Amino acid sequence: MATVSSCLLRRSRTASRIFKTSLRCFSTTSSSAQTVSGSSPFPFTGTNIKTNVSQLIGRTPLVYLSKISEGSGAYIAVKQEMMQPTASVKDRPALAMIEDAEKKGLISPGKTVLIEPTSGNMGISMAFMAAMKGYKMVLTMPSYTSMERRVVMRAFGADLILTDPDKGMGGTVKKANQLLDSTPDGFMLQQFNNPANTQVHFETTGPEIWEDTQGKVDIFVMGIGSGGTVSGVGRYLKSQNPNVKIYGVEPAESNILNGGKPGPHLITGNGVGFKPEILDMDVMDAVLEVKSDDAVKMARQLALQEGLLVGISSGANTIAALDLAKRPENKGKLIVTIHPSFGERYLSSALFKELREEAENMQPVPVE
């Protein structure tokens, strides 16, 4: 039975200092009797039946954008992380951070209350893992995020607290810390500070890209939220080939990594308004800026031209990749990016505003 492969670092719940580093890996194992959590040993050994849903995480495919990149001069391949169990790249770090804390004895199902600030997808992935493992989950989230996110989190049994949209992710983090201080047996995985968030991409996402491209990737470009993906993948690819270029992506309206100021934008999950502790600025060759409107338009274009129904951050990543593909120095190169989430999660957002209104106004036709 395959499991996600990851080597993780131990971190204190309250201190930002890493006080102990321990290497451990999820690995593919087989035994005479696979045990399903909370049940008797699984008797059907040798079958391709997974013993729990977490074993579905990882090994997402790369797809070439033949139409979008046509005439650009370079080749763009996109890793479809929307094909994870909860349709999001965040399934990887959610699993890694929870299992890392469990192995260190920091949390235990039925006792620990997990508390986490989120802009949406990480919260869904954590709620999914908490439901599977038996944890109570409390999430704080800015109220500007989509209705779909709220419903999915609640469907997994998580408690959800919405925060003032004008305070951005900073306000969401502050509220989560307040809840942590007042909750007995509360524990925060701290996605913005937890090195397991980065390391899981170093140990899984990066190697998958390297293997699937047979080491031919020239450029990797990725939107920056917590910074875990771009940092982990970037480190791995550069460890294999120092000449690989790594680019981050942030909203033009909230371009703090390029010296600007935080501000409202539509690229949910990116541009959190502060520099996360785990973000490795040194691994990136540059941070590109993408306007929200352009990201929305590209996400719509991907559905119509490539048959890929993706979210707004996927549109932003594709815009950035296309910009790089058009540069003369990148002619003939292979550019890899990621589609972090599935578009159906954005039905109530600006991405589908016109189509939603059109659908709402549809009238039935008579049938003779």
UniProtKB/Swiss-Prot annotation:
GO biological process: cyanide metabolic process; cysteine biosynthetic process from serine; cysteine metabolic process
Binding site for pyridoxal 5'-phosphate: N121, G225, S226, G227, G228, T229, S313
Localization in the cell: Mitochondrion
GO terms for cellular component: cytoplasm; mitochondrion
Gene Ontology MF terms in the entry: cysteine synthase activity; L-3-cyanoalanine synthase activity
PANTHER family: CYSTATHIONINE BETA-SYNTHASE
Species assigned in the record: Spinacia oleracea
Gene (name only): CYSC
Reported tissue expression: Expressed in green and etiolated seedlings.
Residues bearing the modification N6-(pyridoxal phosphate)lysine: K90
Function: The cyanoalanine synthesis reaction is more efficient than the cysteine synthase activity. Probably involved in the detoxification of cyanide that arises from ethylene biosynthesis.
Cofactor: pyridoxal 5'-phosphate
Name recorded for this polypeptide: Bifunctional L-3-cyanoalanine synthase/cysteine synthase, mitochondrial
